[in-house]
Structures are given as C-alpha cells and as structure tokens.
Amino acid sequence: MAGMRMAAPLMALRSGQSEAAVGVLLALFALTQVFLALPAGRYADAHGLKRPVMWSVLMAFVGAGLAALWPIFPVLCVSALLTGGATGGAIIALQRHVGRAVKDTAQMKQAFSWLSIGPAFSNFIGPFTAGLLIDHAGFQWAYAAMAVLPLLGWLCIRHTRELPPVIKPEGHEKNRA
C-alpha cells in the first residue's frame, strides 16, 4: 500500500487533478480500514491467519493491478480502497496470530519488535521501488510492481503453522464491539 499511496497522488496531480481530489484519494487508503477493522478481526478470530491474509493479498493484487491496467483517477480511488483495506486486514490477522503464538513476555517483546519492522520495511521498499519505476518505466510499471509485492508476502507466510481455534466456554455470550 505504501508504494501505491505514494504513486497514486503523484499521478493524480500530474494528470491535472485538484489538491482536494488528491486529498480525497489519500483519505480513501484509510477509509476501508475504518469500516473493515472489526469485521476483519472477527474473521481472523474465526479463520486464523492464512485465510484473512490470502484475501488481503488478493485485494491488494487486484487494487494495484487495476491501477496498472487502467491508470485513471476513478480507478486509482478504487485501488486506494482495495489496497488500504487489504493492508488493514492483513495487519489485524498478523497481530492476532503473533499475540497468540508467543508463550511468555520475552517472546512477546521479540515477536512484536519483529512485527513492527515489517511495516517499516514496507514503508521504505514500496515507495522506493515505485519511485524508481516511475522515473525509469512509468506509472503503470510501478503499479504492476506494487501488485506483485503482496504475492511475495504471501510466499513468506503460506507455510506458517495455523494455531488451534479459540474455544469459548459454554454459555459464553457473544461479545460485540
């Protein structure tokens, strides 16, 4: 998402969109996260790590792929919604998995330290790669590369061992946020 969040506004400004339109475009990257946070958490609780991340990878791939195929402002807006929501869903599933996988406080500190490095690395590699590709090959190639990056993430976690589901005690009321 970070590469898309950098490239899409640049393309929008270059194509003559107003600053207000670009502001809306940037806001769309967060909008789906607002509305999907609770359902994504419930989905991760019900299905573990891999299925929510698989859906997130698919959403990010489609979002960036659409921008690569049709780099026009309305499609960039759809791409922002898809890639933003995908990022939020994946992070929720990963945080849930890591929190359940640790056995003690020391492991928790180490695991969440590593988990925080992931988004930081993504916030570097995405915009850096997109910027280089925009300069040397154009926006469409940058968007295509941003579509491939989530697939690489999937390759990293596809063999992760799923944790057993959480068994709720009998008579446990369904909590709703």
Task: Give names to the regions the model predicted.
Residues 142-158:
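Symmetry-related core transmembrane helices of the 12-TM Major Facilitator Superfamily/SLC fold
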Residues 30-38, 123-124:
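Residue-level signature of mid-helix packing/kink "hotspots" within the transmembrane helices
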Residues 51-65, 147:
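Structural signature of the two symmetry-related core transmembrane helices
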Residues 37-48, 134:
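Helix-to-loop junctions at the C-terminal end of transmembrane segments
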Residues 16, 48, 69-74:
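Helix-breaking motifs and short loop linkers at transmembrane-helix boundaries and internal kinks
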Residues 81-118:
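Cytoplasmic helix-loop-helix junction between adjacent transmembrane helices
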